């Protein structure tokens, strides 16, 4: 039996959550959403998703803290989705343990390709 790949979206902007959620749902991913960092961290530990899509600019905490805390115990793929476009910020996120970094705005095909790549690399 085929099991859907589970993706946790940690993003506070509803329109972006809806866009990503509908895109992933239509491509047979199981989607869970958290609108803040606290809920996101709780869902990472309780639901153990196959992949996390993470915004850095959350209302209650910086996404960098979520990366660091998750990396203390897990190697699950984390793809940052952020409006932060400075090279320094991208490098910091990748060095903290993010597997990839996509800047907003982004296209559907790029997002799906990066998810497939992260899952493929994690399964090796």
Where are the model-predicted features located?
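N-terminal/domain-start alpha-helical segments
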Residues: 1-123
